[in-house]
């Protein structure tokens, strides 16, 4: 894939830090069933003021067009998750157990300390591969922090199936088995300790299984698809491997109690951030992907710019390439702008890591421009000084109420 899937809304592209993931290989656990697969309520009526991030945003001129087929498909998942959260929130307030009762339940199901160990291991993985985000999770409540770690690990393991050291051995059948494991853990039958942590998470938060299934579908695409004819096609791929993460994690991170935004609009912003981050991955890694025989750019827009696949493989920066890249970067920034509107409506303890990630990732686009659009042989990155400056600024911005 262009740069690996997102592992959490605020820690996109887990593979960028390098390293192997052998310590997350599956192993058996002895966990008893915990819950039935959640069935979301009926979809709510669409609100006139909440529309999904536009796949139809033109690269050269940001005019809004009619909603595309990919947007329609993704929007149904957004509505489904938003409905699940809205239906669960009042019930959660009424039935929430005291912490000591939750701990007794954890011990009853997994045995003394096993679930705690599972979450701790997830935290160790997050700390190793997503240091900045891990730091931000320390501001969250313990329950939310552990849940985000569990989601991160599942996403990273999923990404490693097609981007890891054993990727050449992965088949569609293997991904089918992985999806069956996902269904099992949602039904309370985890296969190993990492699955157990996620199984516990989805029993406590109104998380829908569909975004997880959609991420697996993104992995399936990477087994056979290496070209995207239109941005509509690419948008759907970006949703599968990155936009899904926002839908997974917002139910855990929570929406600010004093927010006036609709649940649906906050999920649209989460989706936009995933799309923006994956587009940034793609634009950063054009040369790397080309060396693997892959092009994650809309071929019709390349043709409109007077460029061909051979121009990508040749890797020479020209006037045509600069003009093309300016349009692609402009579109990614539009998605970042859409995402930033929603971050301020997250729960106050969750805003900082998300906002910091957004600001840092958006600066990669600046770095591509600073490299004179040479993303063939130069890798754009954000220097340590800029990172250190962005973190306190993001913290200050996150402290402002929506």
Curated annotation (Swiss-Prot):
Gene Ontology biological process: carotenoid biosynthetic process
EC numbers, comma separated: 2.5.1.32
Transit peptide: 1-54
PROSITE patterns: SQUALEN_PHYTOEN_SYN_2
Compositionally biased tracts (Low complexity): 44-54
Gene Ontology MF terms: 15-cis-phytoene synthase activity; geranylgeranyl diphosphate synthase activity; squalene synthase [NAD(P)H] activity
Name of this chain's protein: Phytoene synthase 2, chloroplastic
């Amino acid at each position: 894939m262009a740069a690996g899937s997102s592992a959490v809304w605020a820690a996109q592209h887990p593979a960028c830090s390098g390293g192997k993931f052998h310590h997350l290989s599956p192993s058996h656990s002895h966990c008893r069933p915990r819950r039935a697969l959640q069935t979301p309520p009926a979809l709510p009526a669409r609100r006139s003021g909440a529309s999904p991030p536009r796949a139809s945003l033109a690269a050269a001129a940001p005019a809004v067009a009619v909603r595309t087929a990919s947007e329609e498909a993704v929007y149904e998942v957004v509505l489904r998750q938003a409905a699940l959260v809205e239906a669960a929130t009042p019930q959660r307030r009424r039935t929430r157990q005291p912490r000591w009762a939750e701990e007794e339940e954890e011990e009853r199901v997994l045995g003394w300390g096993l679930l705690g160990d599972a979450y701790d291991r997830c935290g160790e993985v997050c700390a190793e591969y997503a240091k900045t985000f891990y730091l931000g999770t320390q501001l969250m409540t313990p329950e939310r922090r552990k849940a985000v770690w569990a989601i991160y690990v599942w996403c990273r393991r999923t990404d490693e199936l097609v981007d890891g050291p054993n990727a050449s051995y992965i088949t569609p059948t293997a991904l089918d088995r992985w999806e069956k494991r996902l269904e099992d853990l949602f039904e309370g039958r985890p296969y190993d300790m990492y699955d157990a942590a996620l199984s516990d998470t989805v029993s406590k938060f109104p998380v829908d299984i569909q975004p997880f299934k959609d991420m697996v579908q993104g992995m399936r695409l990477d087994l056979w698809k290496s070209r995207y004819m239109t941005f509509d096609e690419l948008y759907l791929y970006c949703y599968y491997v990155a936009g899904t993460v926002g839908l997974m994690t917002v139910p855990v991170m929570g929406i600010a109690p004093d927010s006036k935004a609709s649940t649906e609009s906050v999920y649209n912003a989460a989706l936009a951030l995933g799309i923006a981050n994956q587009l940034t991955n793609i634009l950063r890694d054009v040369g790397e992907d080309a060396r693997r025989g892959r092009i994650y750019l809309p071929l019709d827009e390349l043709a409109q710019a007077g460029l061909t696949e051979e121009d990508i493989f040749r890797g020479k920066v020209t006037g045509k390439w600069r003009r093309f890249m300016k349009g692609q970067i402009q579109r990614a920034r539009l998605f970042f702008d859409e995402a930033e509107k929603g971050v301020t409506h997250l729960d106050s303890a969750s805003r900082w890591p998300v906002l910091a990630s957004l600001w840092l990732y958006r600066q990669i686009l600046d770095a591509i421009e600073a490299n004179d659009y040479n993303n063939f042989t130069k890798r754009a990155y954000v220097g340590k000084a800029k990172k250190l400056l962005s973190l306190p600024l993001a913290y200050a911005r996150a402290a402002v109420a929506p």
